[in-house]
């Protein structure tokens, strides 16, 4: 009898071992060669594409989300919603049975509900909220939309219903809720970490309802995500998602060619022909809803002078930059809105390249003998700027022709963003990819007074006539009126020149042939839930 039991036990152990080995062998892993390290894992606080790709996209959901690869909004954590006749009350009916992830610090005891929605927004809205100041508490997207003023209350009707009351109708409100700062965090996890005395863990060890959970992060090296088996839309096709942090585009390509990673962002334009010739690579592309620009700090001399800003704009040989830096992957920009965004004013006339006129303007501004300026260049490739260092050097050479001495400055990406937000720069290469497709998502975060203090307004431009236009457009339900107001805003920006609009680019993404289901995101994010790999 003992022998029989032992034999059965041994056979069972062998079967379990075989199954374990089999599952290990068949586990599907996709490696994404990302361009940089996230600042942290809370998209309410850190909004760069690099941070959002590592937080909002894999870990979290929102009440509404965009259909992958499109600009079409669809229900997500909210199954449906009702809007009052006066346009000021939104009632969201929440999806039932949605599970939160867990980690070594926390195991959820309940499903997603209205408390999580209220926590996620009130943390950003209420200065007295216990989490408001955690992790430095800078909610630039929330504040740039003036959501603190717009939302008068968020009420729990019941566990599966939440009501937002607004001070006035807001045309892009639903679209804004699909923006990544509106990701839904776990209130229960937050309460647990607050009691443990480690509230910042919520932002560094995230727990969401999304398709992947964060398993490991080695700064500047690697991020490991594992598929969340209880994801409400069904488990992802891949088991592991690895971000191999690789700042150099040439190194990213070398890894892709050796199948050390299967997807890479922001290729060097010069490498595109090589990728097209490689039978193992599928070079995907889509028109990007983005704009690369040079922001002038309008609160610092000498760029606080509009004539100086206009002169510096006229001195930039934009066509030469498009040819040398973008190499066929970009078109010259003359206003903030790219052609794919409604109300973009194609009739607006760009500043001509005119060094002599620029010199005359500098003289009028009191700088007949020229001036010295710092010119900041971002250290990473972005969808709207494949080579900021090269672009800065070309602008530096252009400005030298009108007597302007520019010193090119750069920092590590997180430090660069931090310093630009605090206004240390005079002129900085920046850019934007819309998160919603609405014109307000360009004007509001980037150039309104509200976003000038610690927000995404890198020009630190606060111009009341412009602010009034944007507010009027945002609160109007008349589409044609909004179009007219946004066109007026584009002309006003052209005249005041808080930033030189340089380029709109096409997004190119090389993907290994082993990968299926990948879609280029028009908003510039990298989404892997729907992806499979052989």
What role is predicted for each listed range?
Residues 212, 303, 332-365, 382-390:
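Structural transition elements
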């Amino acid at each position: 009898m003992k022998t029989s039991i032992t034999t059965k036990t041994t056979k069972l152990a062998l079967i379990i071992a075989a199954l374990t080995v089999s599952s290990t062998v068949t586990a599907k892993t996709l490696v994404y060669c990302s361009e940089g390290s996230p600042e942290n894992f809370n998209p309410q606080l850190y909004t760069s594409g690099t941070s959002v790709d590592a937080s909002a996209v894999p870990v979290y959901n929102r009440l509404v989300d965009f259909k992958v690869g499109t600009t079409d909004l669809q229900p997500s954590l909210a199954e449906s919603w009702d809007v009052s006749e006066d346009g000021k009350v939104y009632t969201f009916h929440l999806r039932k049975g949605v599970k939160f992830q867990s980690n070594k610090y926390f195991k959820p005891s309940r499903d997603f509900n209205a408390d999580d929605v209220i926590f996620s927004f009130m943390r950003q809205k209420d200065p007295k909220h216990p989490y408001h100041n955690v992790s430095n508490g800078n909610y630039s997207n929330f504040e740039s939309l003036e959501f603190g003023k717009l939302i008068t209350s968020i009420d729990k009707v019941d566990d599966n219903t939440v009501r937002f009351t607004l001070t006035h109708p807001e045309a892009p409100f639903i679209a804004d809720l699909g923006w990544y700062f509106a990701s839904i965090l776990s209130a229960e996890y937050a309460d647990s970490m607050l009691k443990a005395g480690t509230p910042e863990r919520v932002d560094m060890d995230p727990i969401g309802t999304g398709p992947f959970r964060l398993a490991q992060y080695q700064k500047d090296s690697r991020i490991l995500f594992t598929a969340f088996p209880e994801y409400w839309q069904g488990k992802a096709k891949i088991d592991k998602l690895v971000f191999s942090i690789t700042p150099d585009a040439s190194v990213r390509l070398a890894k892709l060619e050796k199948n050390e990673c299967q997807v890479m962002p922001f290729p060097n334009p010069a490498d595109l022909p090589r990728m097209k010739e490689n039978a193992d690579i599928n070079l995907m592309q889509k028109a990007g809803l983005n704009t690369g620009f040079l922001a002038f700090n309008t609160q610092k001399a000498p760029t606080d002078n509009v004539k100086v800003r206009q002169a510096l704009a006229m001195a930039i040989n934009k066509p030469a930059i498009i040819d040398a830096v973008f190499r066929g992957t970009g078109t010259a920009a003359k206003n903030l809105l790219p052609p794919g965004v409604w109300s973009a004013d194609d009739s607006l006339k760009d500043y001509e390249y005119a060094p002599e006129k620029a010199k005359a303007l500098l003289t009028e501004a009191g700088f007949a003998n020229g001036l010295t300026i710092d010119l900041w260049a971002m250290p990473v490739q972005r969808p709207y700027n494949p080579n900021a260092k090269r672009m800065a050097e070309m602008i530096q050479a252009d400005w030298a022709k009108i007597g302007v001495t520019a010193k090119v400055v750069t920092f590590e990406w997180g430090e660069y963003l931090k310093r630009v937000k605090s206004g240390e720069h005079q002129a900085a290469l920046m850019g934007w990819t819309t998160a919603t497709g609405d014109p307000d998502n360009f004007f509001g975060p980037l150039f309104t007074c509200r976003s000038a203090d610690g927000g995404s307004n890198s020009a630190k431009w606060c111009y009341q006539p412009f602010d009034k236009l944007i507010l009027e457009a945002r609160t109007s339900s008349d589409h044609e009126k909004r179009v007219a107001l946004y066109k007026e805003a584009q002309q006003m920006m052209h005249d005041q020149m808080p930033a030189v609009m340089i380029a709109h680019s096409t997004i190119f993404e090389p993907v290994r042939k082993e990968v299926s289901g990948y879609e280029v995101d028009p908003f510039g994010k990298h989404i892997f839930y729907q992806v499979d790999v052989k």
